[in-house]
């Protein structure tokens, strides 16, 4: 399984590659889009101006492509807003053509109407080598949906955050059986920003002024009659307490599920990191690389989980914010 990490500026490319990323993805918002639509109609799912979360100029695209040629770690570009208005589609296609001119061929898309527009109005892009990754911001993912989306010549499915491992395995095995001539790639979320919703039904803003909802701490549990959440007692602190903000996977972690994800047929692992501190993302990439190395050298799932936790969580306390329920 390959590590796919998000970057927010070209300065992050080399550190993330050296940390162990196999692929990278980013957003690109050119000035023409910002001037006309601002952040009210975002080009991707980061409605942000004031910190590094987007590539913003053609020159940056050109510089980053030189890095890709040097390090051979590809970059895909996200056009993954949940929807666009009709007048925007022609501009989006123009931006995609511009990206392809500089060597970028892979785009992450969530809006079904954009896929329809591309197929009907810009079929030449596929002839030029365009690849489509179906975003984790797309709505429900099931076998019938995958059959329908094959009409748009997708190359990869990014499962959304609420797909169970058994669901993924069922869909992947079905696709392999029904389409042996054209195998897809399959990507699953593995670290950070475990959304309270699924991406398609998240209508919060990922912007400068408001905290991301996926980073607002919360706790699930039963509340006794007559008790309010603010009166609930917090868990007793461990004798070897860690700083939660520095813990791997504090906002979402699927490391324990790597064994089952591999069995299910997952080929790529998404590390959510656009806009995060560079040092934090490098730590996360290294931790995931360590977990994958342990996975390759253990004989069974309990052995893997035990070894991984001892290596990455030496105090014995992980975040407990699990992406997947592993039983």
Question: Where are the regions that the model predicts?
Answer:
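A cross-taxonomic marker for long C-terminal extensions/tails that follow the last structured domain
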Residues: 147-157
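Short, glycine/polar-rich helix-capping loops at beta-to-alpha or helix-loop-helix junctions
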Residues: 142-145
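Active-site pocket-lining/capping segments in soluble small-molecule metabolic enzymes
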Residues: 1-140, 159-327
């Amino acid at each position: 399984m390959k590590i796919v990490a998000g970057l927010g500026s070209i300065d992050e490319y080399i550190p993330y590659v050296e940390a162990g990323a196999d692929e990278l993805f980013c957003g690109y918002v050119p000035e023409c889009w910002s001037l006309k639509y601002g952040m009210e109609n975002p080009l991707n799912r980061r409605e942000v101006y004031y910190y590094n979360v987007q590539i913003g100029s053609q020159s940056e695209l050109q510089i980053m492509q030189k890095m890709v040629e040097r390090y051979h770690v590809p970059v895909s570009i996200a056009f993954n807003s949940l929807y666009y208005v009709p007048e925007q589609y022609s501009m989006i296609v123009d931006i995609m053509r511009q990206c392809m001119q500089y060597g970028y061929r892979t785009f992450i898309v969530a809006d079904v109407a954009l896929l329809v527009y591309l197929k009907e109005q810009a079929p030449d892009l596929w002839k030029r080598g365009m690849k489509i990754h179906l975003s984790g911001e797309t709505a429900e993912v099931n076998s019938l949906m995958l059959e329908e989306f094959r009409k748009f010549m997708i190359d990869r499915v990014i499962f959304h955050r609420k797909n169970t491992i058994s669901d993924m395995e069922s869909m992947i095995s079905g696709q392999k059986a029904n389409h042996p001539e054209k195998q897809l790639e399959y990507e699953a979320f593995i670290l950070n920003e475990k959304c309270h919703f699924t991406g398609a039904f998240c209508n919060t803003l990922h912007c400068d002024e408001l905290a991301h909802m996926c980073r607002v701490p919360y706790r699930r549990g039963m509340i006794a009659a007559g008790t309010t959440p603010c009166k609930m007692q917090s868990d007793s602190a461990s004798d070897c307490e860690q700083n939660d903000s520095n813990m791997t996977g504090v906002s979402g972690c699927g490391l324990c599920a790597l064994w089952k994800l591999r069995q299910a047929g997952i080929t790529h692992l998404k590390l959510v990191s656009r806009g995060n501190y560079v040092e934090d993302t490098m730590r996360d990439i290294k931790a995931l690389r360590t977990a994958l190395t342990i996975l390759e050298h253990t004989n069974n799932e309990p052995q893997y989980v035990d070894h991984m936790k001892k290596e990455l969580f030496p105090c014995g306390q992980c975040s407990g914010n699990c992406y997947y329920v592993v039983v």
